[in-house]
């Protein structure tokens, strides 16, 4: 019995050995026959370090199939064949390949049909005897070399390598090993761990290892224990169930299959794995060939990989694998596929080569046991793992059309080849013919371009046909595509009037636009710079030369191509903006990457577009077909530049030598017709610290950024500038620049100061109208005048000062209002807008801040997840992991914390309306969406800090450090008393911070965490449905994870705040450590005690200190005195405007400073009142004139009034000294001077004064009574000699008897010395008539007027006129009456008061000083009148005197 059992076992073992022998049949002898078909190596002289084809003699016909297949039969000696190129239509492509004449074997059928004929033994053999046939199964030598002067591959050799469908895989090596064959992988061990020793980026993560699985994938983490079909990734129950990270080329349970002895490729079935590292520096032959083949396959197969150079390559091959669960005969039903991984440790590309697919599914997935048909086919795609994201390659994955993988793809022209980019996102590089849906993702690169156009966009999506038209639609513009191959078309982006993300769609033939994507349009001023200016000469007025450079490979790789350099300009004279061609700078020039522009070559140009003052340089190919043989040409644009270097001679001929002034004046006139926009702009912060903290309204200016662009060409002296993040309602933009001391720079002080802009760089919707085009309108309205008014003129020019002071003046910070700030950090801790600090460990999604004002809505929400376990187990605390926000009608922005192992490149994920956006390129640092601007600092590439600015002035900042986030919200003052949420109500009152959704205020104790949790925090939890007062969640939902996945209202965190109260007594070290790390910061101590994580504690303290300092900085009221204008033609020695600042002034040479030389800023925010007037600078000549006029003015305004006052004073003094009769009144006389003189001659009354007070005649009032109060009591009576009493004012020769000075005497008719009175006709009046009144007048009878004593009636007008005609003497002598016959005044010789010629006594009688009684009263003189004296010399004679001698005519009685 035992013998029988032994025989049975022996037979069984023998049978198994036979089966295994057939399964793993050796092909060494067969390979030796093929290799030895050439009896001796052919020695060919080749140049050093260069591979050449081996020229072999013509060979005899190939041996028969039976002889070749029989391992016992030796092949006949073959002559040396000759390699000749022949056109071979391959089943894997249409490329021309090389074959061997006379040795083309017949097609063999079996488990595997190679894509190309097996020609390995006929390729070149090196000195070591190795055959470099691409299909050779023996691995090359492992002698890596990096020495200079190594192997150089030729274009022919590269074409030969790339003509093969499959990459290298070897089952032998030159040292007797198994090559790449993984003999340890079999049914009982389906995977092997492989160390890569380099970083492999994959789906956001990065790995330095992998696991090679027999089941058709490379994995990086453990799969779930049980799989259910169809497979769904990511695993929704993660982390309860494992969610593997893998690359699945054919994810299905497999086993090693078998091959037939008749198969051409007799390499051992199974799994192969090969790694080639450090290819960038290798010079050995195999390393160079692997690098070049992989590089060009990827560059030409995937859009956007034009600069990719592989650093490491992994080749994994599954050869002749069968499905699991099948019968023995099913082992011959096999699939062969290959995965090629290439990475430079930043980008990763994968090539899937499907050679043969004969089965679809294994038995556990429902497939049959014989053919592997039916059931759920294999999974093809990628899974990031850890429950994050996955990509399933549709329509092939888990679908019956999966067998078409071997006939689709068309990457590099091969059916069955599919290429993907997998480092951050999965981007397909192969066409997809069978998929159909309403919206299909379009793969294109680059994903952004200059607004001016010319960007070549490579597009992959549907499978293309050269006979079918392809239309590309960029926003509102459409262009036709250019066919490249079945997998790619090219569209050249047209000129677009838009910015930000626009719709990008294509249609094939007559189909609708169902392939769609988002294309980012870069504004010309912020676009990727492709033409560089080595100096700033292009901005000058008249440069000698301008040097430009560019990357020649941005146009073409053809070194012999020529380029054309042209000049373009822009203007806005109509509603539609005009970007027009100006001139050709160089018609044809070698594409060398540099050129020198000589402006003197264009002096004589007379261009019709000379009104254009700024424009662009454009470089394109002279012959478009030089770009990859296609009739297209890329276009390179410069940044906007001024055009004085080209247009200056033309402007000078048109406007004269002062053409800059003319251009400036034209702009000023036009700008004055436009509306004033400055009132709409936010005010500039006073200091740089305030500007940096105002995250809601201001962002760094690209032109002057302290972190990325400190040159500040148009703001010299500035170290940093900020601009308003979003356009205001009218489209304007604010700019604020700060000097090295952190103070605001003003245009009132210098031309380099802050300048507001009429048009924002982002433009304004709609972008296709004048004054609304991004960048171009800003340059037309704001940048262009800066050059013509200031940069090309003097700073003190009239146009520049008009530009600085009137049209673009800086806005000072007198009324600036710092924003309110609130934040969340740690596990988590909150600081409200009013400064209340508390802790709330909610688990789920909550409202951080929201507006209760319906007109200005905004929402900021946060997601909190539980912290990972620590050494002691579960941590009863949470942390912030995501923030979502939205304005009134703006785009929804979400910022997420990336998984731990996915933070190697990007720290945070940013989603705009659910679509991931990235900020890893300069032109993408600032991205504008509908109503919101998102940017990352220019010095960061890892997206660890993201700032979101809404058009309402709201800002949200999210910062990540070591996996721990903080979120801060910045609000302008218009939201005071209009906020709610976990950040409280901003009212400057801490008592109402805990406002509930219903508007009530919860009265809570900050130390009672349980009460805060249950009575306040949990009330703000979000759900996916709208809740009154709370709202709905804004977060993007992926893979079925709704708000309930994150929320847990029953979560009970630790409610004890002090670590000393909740840490066990045996953990005193942790308590001491917390105090050591945190000091007195309770939030830091709490976080360390809860998590034992030093990083969390450190950044909790850092975030807390930061927000407290921010609130303290913004709480301080900054006092500013505002603008203090610089005098024209002068300067200020300091630009400070803070309290205590003392600013001194100086003038330029040739000018004089007048006014205050120094002003001081007071503590009340006002400049001190000038003591000497407004400060200004005058030219010396003007200053001299001013001084002279001031002196003359002083003379007239000071000395003359002073003299007048002196005269008046003397006059008043003399008036007081005069003696006058109090009873006397001057009779009423006509106003005529002549009449007055005649009347005075007819009057003969006693005057109360002897003479005038001065030579200046003063009008007297003759209706008054003057009293002299004489004689004086106690004084002697003195008799004065008689004098000439009355002279006319024209008698200038009359000399007083008391001196030599001429004296003007009053024109009065005096009484005679005897006291005899005359009537109104000059006749004596008898004083012995007591019954008659002397003062009686006939007119008094009618008027009833009673005149005082001594009043004499004036002459009638007729009498006065008659008397005027007599031409009487000024002395009123008697000669007048003798010579005038018409006069009624008769000379009376008996009159005591007259001489013989009718003269008047010089001095009156002494009776004039006394009051005269009425005529009816007899009076006796007090003393006898002296003898009258006569003076006949020096007095004018009457004109009609008839004296016999001249002495008689000129004499006057004295």
UniProtKB/Swiss-Prot annotation:
Residue ranges, Extracellular side: 22-1186
Major site of localization recorded for this protein: other
Cysteine pairings via disulfide bonds: 1121-1161, 1147-1177
Compartments, as annotated in UniProt: Cell junction, Septate junction; Apicolateral cell membrane
GO biological process: cell-matrix adhesion; smooth septate junction assembly
Keyword Disulfide bond attached: yes
Sequence ranges assigned to domain Sushi in this UniProt record: 1119-1179
Sequence ranges on the Cytoplasmic membrane side: 1208-1454
Task of the protein: Required, together with Ssk and Tsp2A, for the proper organization of smooth septate junctions (sSJs), probably by mediating cell adhesion via its homophilic interaction. Also required for the correct subcellular localization of several sSJ components, such as Ssk, cora and l(2)gl, and for the barrier function of the midgut epithelium. Required for maintaining the three-layered structure of the proventriculus.
This protein's name: Protein mesh
């Amino acid at each position: 019995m035992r013998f029988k059992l032994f025989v049975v076992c022996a037979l069984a073992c023998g049978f198994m050995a036979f089966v295994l022998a057939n399964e793993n049949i050796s092909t060494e002898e067969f390979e030796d026959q093929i290799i030895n078909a050439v009896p001796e190596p052919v020695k060919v002289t080749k140049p050093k370090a260069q591979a050449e084809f081996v020229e072999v003699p013509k060979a005899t016909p190939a041996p028969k199939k039976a002889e070749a297949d029989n391992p016992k039969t030796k092949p006949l000696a073959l002559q040396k064949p000759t390699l000749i190129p022949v056109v071979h239509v391959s089943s894997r492509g249409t490329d021309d390949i090389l074959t061997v004449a006379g040795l083309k074997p017949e097609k063999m059928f079996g488990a595997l049909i190679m894509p190309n004929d097996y020609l390995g033994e006929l390729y070149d053999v090196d000195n070591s005897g190795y055959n470099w046939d691409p299909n050779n199964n023996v691995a090359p030598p492992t002698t890596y070399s990096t020495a200079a002067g190594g192997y150089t591959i030729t274009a022919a050799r590269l074409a030969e390598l790339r003509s093969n469908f499959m990459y290298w895989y070897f089952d032998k090596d030159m040292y007797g090993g198994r090559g790449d064959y993984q003999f340890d992988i079999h049914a009982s061990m389906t995977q092997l761990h492989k160390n890569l020793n380099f970083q492999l980026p994959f789906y956001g993560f990065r790995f330095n290892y992998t696991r090679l699985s027999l089941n058709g994938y490379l994995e990086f983490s453990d799969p779930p224990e049980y799989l259910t079909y169809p497979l769904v990734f990511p695993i929704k129950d993660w982390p309860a169930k494992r969610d593997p990270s893998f690359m699945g080329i054919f994810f299905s349970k497999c086993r090693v299959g078998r091959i037939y002895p008749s198969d051409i490729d007799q390499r051992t079935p199974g799994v192969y794995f090969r790694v080639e590292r450090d290819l960038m520096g290798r010079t050995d032959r195999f390393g160079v060939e692997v690098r070049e083949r992989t590089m060009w396959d990827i560059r030409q197969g995937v859009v956007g990989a034009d600069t990719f150079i592989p650093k490491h390559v992994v080749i994994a091959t599954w050869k002749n694998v069968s499905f699991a669960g099948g019968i023995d005969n099913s082992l011959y039903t096999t699939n062969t596929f290959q995965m090629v991984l290439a990475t430079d440790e930043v980008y990763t590309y994968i090539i899937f080569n499907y050679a043969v697919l004969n089965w679809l599914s294994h038995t556990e997935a429902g497939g049959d046991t014989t053919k592997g048909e039916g059931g759920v086919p294999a999974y093809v795609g990628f899974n990031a793992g850890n429950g994050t994201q996955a990509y399933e390659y549709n329509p092939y994955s888990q679908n019956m059309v999966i067998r078409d993988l071997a006939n689709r793809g068309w990457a590099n022209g091969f059916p069955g080849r599919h290429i993907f980019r997998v480092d951050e996102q999965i981007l397909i590089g192969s066409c997809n013919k069978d998929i159909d849906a309403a919206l299909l993702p379009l793969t294109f690169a680059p994903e952004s371009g200059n607004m001016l156009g010319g960007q070549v966009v490579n597009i992959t999506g549907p499978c293309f046909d050269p006979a079918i038209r392809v239309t590309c639609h960029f926003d509102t513009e459409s262009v036709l595509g250019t066919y490249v191959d079945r997998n790619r078309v090219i569209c050249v982006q047209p000129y677009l009037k838009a910015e930000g993300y626009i719709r990008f769609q294509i249609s094939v033939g007559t189909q609708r636009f169902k392939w769609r994507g988002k294309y980012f349009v870069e504004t010309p001023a912020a676009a990727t710079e492709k033409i560089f200016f080595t100096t700033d000469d292009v901005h000058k007025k008249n440069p000698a030369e301008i040097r430009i450079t560019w990357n020649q490979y941005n146009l073409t790789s053809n070194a012999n191509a020529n380029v054309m350099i042209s000049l373009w300009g822009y203007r806005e004279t109509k509603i539609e903006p005009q970007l027009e061609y100006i001139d050709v700078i160089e018609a044809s020039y070698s594409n060398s990457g540099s050129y020198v522009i000589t402006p003197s070559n264009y002096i004589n140009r007379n261009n019709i577009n000379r009104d254009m003052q700024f424009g662009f340089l454009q470089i394109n190919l002279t012959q478009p077909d030089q770009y990859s043989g296609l009739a297209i040409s890329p276009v390179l644009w410069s940044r906007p530049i001024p055009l004085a270097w080209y247009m200056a001679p033309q402007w000078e001929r048109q406007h004269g030598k002062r053409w800059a002034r003319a251009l400036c004046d034209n702009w000023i006139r036009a700008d004055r017709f436009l509306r004033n926009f400055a009132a709409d702009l936010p005010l500039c912060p006073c200091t740089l610290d305030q500007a940096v903290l105002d995250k809601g309204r201001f962002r760094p200016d690209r032109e002057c950024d302290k972190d990325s662009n400190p040159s500040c060409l148009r703001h010299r002296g500035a170290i940093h500038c900020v601009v308003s993040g979003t356009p205001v309602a009218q489209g304007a933009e604010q700019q604020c620049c700060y000097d090295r001391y952190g103070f605001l720079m003003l245009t009132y002080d210098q031309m380099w100061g802050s300048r507001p802009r009429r048009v924002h760089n982002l433009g304004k919707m709609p972008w296709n109208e004048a004054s609304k085009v991004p960048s171009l309108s800003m340059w037309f309205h704001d940048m262009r005048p800066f050059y013509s008014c200031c940069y090309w003129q003097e700073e003190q020019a009239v146009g520049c000062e008009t530009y600085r002071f009137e049209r673009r003046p800086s806005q000072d910070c007198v009324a600036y209002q710092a924003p309110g700030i609130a934040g969340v950090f740690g596990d988590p801790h909150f600081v409200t807008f009013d400064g209340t600090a508390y802790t709330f460990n909610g688990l789920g999604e909550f409202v951080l801040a929201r507006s209760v004002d319906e007109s200005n809505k905004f929402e900021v929400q946060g997601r909190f997840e539980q912290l990972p376990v620590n050494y002691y187990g579960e941590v009863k605390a949470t942390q912030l992991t995501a923030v979502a926000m939205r304005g009134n009608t703006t785009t929804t922005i979400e910022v997420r914390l990336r998984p731990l192992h996915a933070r190697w490149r990007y720290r945070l994920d940013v989603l705009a309306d659910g679509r991931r956006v990235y900020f890893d390129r300069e032109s993408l640092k600032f991205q504008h969406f509908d109503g919101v601007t998102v940017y990352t600092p220019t010095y960061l590439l890892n997206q660890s800090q993201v700032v979101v600015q809404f058009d309402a002035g709201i800002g949200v900042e999210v910062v990540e450090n070591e996996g721990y986030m903080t979120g801060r919200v910045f609000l302008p003052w218009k939201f005071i008393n209009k906020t709610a949420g976990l950040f409280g109500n901003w009212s400057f009152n801490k008592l109402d911070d805990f406002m509930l959704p219903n508007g009530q205020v919860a009265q809570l104790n900050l130390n009672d965490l349980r009460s805060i949790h249950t009575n306040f925090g949990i009330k703000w939890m979000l759900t996916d449905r709208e809740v009154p007062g709370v709202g709905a969640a804004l977060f993007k939902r992926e893979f079925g994870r709704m708000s309930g996945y994150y929320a847990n209202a029953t979560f009970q965190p630790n409610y004890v705040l002090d670590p000393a109260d909740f840490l066990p007594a045996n953990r005193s070290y942790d308590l001491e450590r917390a105090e050591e790390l945190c000091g007195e910061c309770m939030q830091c101590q709490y976080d360390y005690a809860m998590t034992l994580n030093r990083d969390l504690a450190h950044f909790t303290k850092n975030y807390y200190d930061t927000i407290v300092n921010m609130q303290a900085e913004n709480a301080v009221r900054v006092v500013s005195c505002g603008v203090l204008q610089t005098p024209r033609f002068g300067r200020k020695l300091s630009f400070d405007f803070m309290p205590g600042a003392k600013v001194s002034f100086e003038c330029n040479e040739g000018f004089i400073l007048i006014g205050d030389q120094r002003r001081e800023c007071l503590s009340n925010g006002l400049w001190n009142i000038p003591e000497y007037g407004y400060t200004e600078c005058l030219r010396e000549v003007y200053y001299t004139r001013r001084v002279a006029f001031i002196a003359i003015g002083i003379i007239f305004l000071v000395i003359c009034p002073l003299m007048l006052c002196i005269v008046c004073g003397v006059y008043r003094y003399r008036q007081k000294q005069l003696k006058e009769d109090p009873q006397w009144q001057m009779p009423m006389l006509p106003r005529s001077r002549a009449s007055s003189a005649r009347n005075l001659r007819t009057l003969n009354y006693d005057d109360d004064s002897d003479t005038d007070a001065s030579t200046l005649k003063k009008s007297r009032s003759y209706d008054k009574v003057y009293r002299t109060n004489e004689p004086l009591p106690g004084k002697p009576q003195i008799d004065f000699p008689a004098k000439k009493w009355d002279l006319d004012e024209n008698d200038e020769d009359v000399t007083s008897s008391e001196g030599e000075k001429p004296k003007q005497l009053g024109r009065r008719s005096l009484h005679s010395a005897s006291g005899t009175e005359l009537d109104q006709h000059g006749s004596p009046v008898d004083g012995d008539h007591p019954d008659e009144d002397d003062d009686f007048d006939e007119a008094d009878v009618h008027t009833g007027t009673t005149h005082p004593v001594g009043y004499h009636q004036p002459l009638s007008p007729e009498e006065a006129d008659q008397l005027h005609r007599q031409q009487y003497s000024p002395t009123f002598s008697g000669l007048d009456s003798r010579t005038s016959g018409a006069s009624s005044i008769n000379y009376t010789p008996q009159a005591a008061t007259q001489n013989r010629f009718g003269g008047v006594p010089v001095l009156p009688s002494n009776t004039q000083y006394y009051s005269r009684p009425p005529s009816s009263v007899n009076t006796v003189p007090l003393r006898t009148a002296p003898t009258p004296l006569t003076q006949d010399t020096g007095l004018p004679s009457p004109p009609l005197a008839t004296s016999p001698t001249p002495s008689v005519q000129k004499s006057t009685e004295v």
